[in-house]
Structures are given as structure tokens and as C-alpha cells.
Amino acid sequence: MLRAVMDSSQTDVEKSARNRIAWRLLPFLFLLYVANYLDRTNIAYATLGMKGDLGLTDSVFGTASGIFFIGYLGLQIPGALLVEQWSARRLLALTLITWGALTTLTSFVHTPLQLYGARFLLGAAEAGFFPGVIVYLSHWFIYEDRAKAVARFMSAIPIGFILGGPIAGKILGLHWLGLFGWRWLFLFEGVPAVLLGIATLFVLPDRPNEVRWLRGDERDWLTCRLAEERRAIAHVEHVTIWQALRHPTVLLLTVGLFFTYTGGYAFWFWMPTMLQRLTGWTDIQRIGWIGSIPFIAGLIGMLLLGWSSDRVRERRWHFAAPQLTAAVALTIWLLLSHSNGLLLTVFTLVGFGTVAYLPSFWALPSAFLTSSAAAAAVGFINCTASIGGFFGPKVIGDLSERSGSFNGGFAFMIVCLVIASVLVLICPRERVPGVSA
């Protein structure tokens, strides 16, 4: 009887701590990531006005979109390690303020070369944010909650696109003070990141032992549980930072994510232009609203698959299935006669497939690595795979400019998504007891 009462009390403490952590941290992190994706991807809509003003070709736009990821490469591993060994609060605040200022300054570019420079610097400024947050979540969420936490955080990606399209459509119609609407778009969307960066210094705690909103028993439970998980992983295999970067599973995940990013960012950056050309629509506000639909599907898929992945404790098929769905949808577009209705259906499925996999994938590294090794692996995977974010948009632009059609680009995306799925499916199983990869 006494043991039953103690078990019930322990369960209540665990449930209370898990709920309190989720409600305290995830809404603010979600807001930061919405700002991140608004600033990263607003060029997808800005180009509808920039092309005429700056004389951009498809190839130049593809390069400008993708060069962000060249700047993004260098600082991701240091960013993840600084969160592990220094301070998430300070690093994320610095990152937000810097990228917000650079987004605002992008409104003053006048040549393609200046646009390349602005996008490169923006990528460098944003580099530490995502891997830093992934490592930060592992300091607060136990393993069985981690994919759900990542899913809720990363739901900001489709939300950023869902909001970004209509907002951009409205702002692009402005012509205040003799400035084109695309310049106002960069001006307006950089300011929230700066303000949120300042707020981060006062809102975001670094570690559980720093907060007063957890009771003592909740804090003790969380600290012990996270320590047990780290010991369980370390007991199976002790991996140093340098060993982690050469770990076969890390390398497979890296190459798999490279192909995912190549296909995904190709679609994300080019989708508004594809909609405009393939439908013949000229109303930018209409394109903005319709362009949000694929990402609504992605948001729903992300939340459902993140929940399912934790429930059945499986990651690899939850990564592959949505991407194979997107590949099949694009194949159907290439094989069937075209209509606007079919295009919107295909784009909705591609939006689902290129977003829904995210939480399952980012729950994988912490399943077989711990502490600084996991932090380094997250940074290494994301920074190396991000090269795909350069190649994807650039290849689509080059193929479109040469052929006058997006069909070659669609075929390229199909190949990338299939290769990514196969590579992650052949990864070894995870090492956390009771979890299937």
C-alpha cells in the first residue's frame, strides 16, 4: 500500500514537471523559430518584386537563395557546443539580434553581388540557432518527450511559411517613400528578431537548477532522469566528440539530410515562383495565401508524426514515409496532364513530405550519443547537410533557365527525396533501451 502511494506521488511529480517545462519553454522557442524562418525564407516572396527591380535571372535568384547556406556552414558546431558548455540564453540572444539587423540591412541592396553578400552574412548569423536549440531541448526534455518537443518547436517552420506568404503578399503591394514593397518586406521582418533577441536574455533559462518555477521535487526528478539517460547511453558506448563526427550512423544521417535539404529547400524557395508561372496568376496576395496551404499540411503532418514517433518509439520510417509521399506526388505531376487543381494537390503533398519528417529525424542523434558528443553531432549533421540548401535552389534555377520548364527540377527533387529516405532507413537501430530506430 505504501509503495503504491509512493509510486503515485512520483508519477504526479513527473507529470507536473513535464507539463510545466513544456509550457514554460516551448511557446517562446516556437516564437523565436517563426522569426527565424520569416527572415530566412522571405526572399522566396521578395523575388516576385526583386526580379524586375534588380534584374535577377532564375540562376541568380537560385544562387542568392542558396548562398545563405554557405555562410550557414561554419558556425553550427561551435554554436551547439557553446550551448552545451557556455550559455544557451546568451548565444541565442546574440544570434537573434545579429540576424534581425542583417535582414533589415538587406532592404538596401542594389545589385546581385550585394544580395549575395547579405544572404551569406545572414546564413552565418543564423548558424548557431537551430543546433543550439536542439541541444538545449536535451537539457530539459526526457527522451520519450523529445520528439514531441522538437515537433512543437519545429512546427514554427510551416507556421513561418503559413504566415509569411500572406504577410509578404500584403507588404509587397506597398510603395511608401518611393521604395518598392520588397524593400519594406526586409525592413519590417528584421525588427521582430532584434526585439526577441533582447527578450531572450530575460526569458530563457539555461539549466533546470536555475529556475524557480520548478518545485524542488520536480527539479530533482528531472535532474536524476536526464542523468540516468546519459549513463545508459554512455554504458552502451562511450563516444568522444571526434569519434562522434566519424560515427557511421552520424555520417549516414548527414548524407541523408543533405539530400532531404536539397529537395526540400528547392521546393520551399521556388514554390511561390512555381505557383506564379505554372498557374499564370499575377495577384501576389493570392499567391501568398494559396502558397500557405502546403505548409498547413506540413504542420499537421509534423505534429501527428512527432506524436506517433514517440508513441511507437520509432524514428526511421517516420522520417522516410512523408518524403516518399512527396516523391510520389511529384512523379504523378510529371506523368499526368496538368491542371491547377492537380498542381495544388501535388504541392500540398510535397509540403507535407518536406516538413513532417523533422521531429523524428532530430530525435535520432541523442538516441545513441550523449553530452558534448551529441551536441557536436547535431551541429555537424545540420551544417554539413545544409550544403543541400545551397545546391537545391541553385540547381532548380539553372535547370529552369536552360529549359524554360520546372519538370527537370521536379525530377531532381524526386531523386533527392528517395535517396534521403533510403539512407536513413539503412541506419543502425538506436541504442536507447526500448526504442526502435
Segments (PLM) and residue ranges:
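Helix-breaking motifs and short loop linkers at transmembrane-helix boundaries and internal kinks
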Residues: 55, 87, 108-114, 125, ...
